[in-house]
């Protein structure tokens, strides 16, 4: 089975993935069910791709890098500026990079965010599946999941799940 690139992310009802300052503390205030399907999803991937800003937030929020058991890549404009034994830093196009990854044996590839990375991948049609959990809060402002896109992407609903008051939408390319 071919590996897929999967965007797995939470958004507010108004489409924000973080507050304007990049904080995601609003997610901590949400009461769902267990881990809202995260553990089940995490078992389906063996590779995690992060943008530089998200990587830096993760390093601040967690004393131990949380993806040590996965192959982890961070997209950055200056890969030589970073060093981390758990991460490979990348500066190349999303489509070319993921095409190479898909040729390797393995499980799915998690596109973990943030917004700049997601939009770069969207512009290159490099996301195969979208698993988006909508959290019942309207932030009013913040960092939108999708912005400045010019290409239309048609999707087909694969399924939905409810976790307490949150709804998870699973789409594949149409």
From Swiss-Prot:
The gene is ywjB. This is Uncharacterized protein YwjB. It is found in: Membrane. One of its GO terms (biological process) is riboflavin biosynthetic process. The keyword Transmembrane applies. It comes from the Bacteria. One of its GO terms (molecular function) is 5-amino-6-(5-phosphoribosylamino)uracil reductase activity. Keywords: Membrane, Transmembrane, Transmembrane helix. Pfam families: RibD_C (PF01872). To B.subtilis YyaP. The chain crosses the membrane at residues 126-146. One of its GO terms (cellular component) is membrane. The keyword Transmembrane helix applies. PANTHER family: 2,5-DIAMINO-6-RIBOSYLAMINO-4(3H)-PYRIMIDINONE 5'-PHOSPHATE REDUCTASE, DIHYDROFOLATE REDUCTASE FAMILY PROTEIN (AFU_ORTHOLOGUE AFUA_8G06820). It is a single-pass membrane protein.
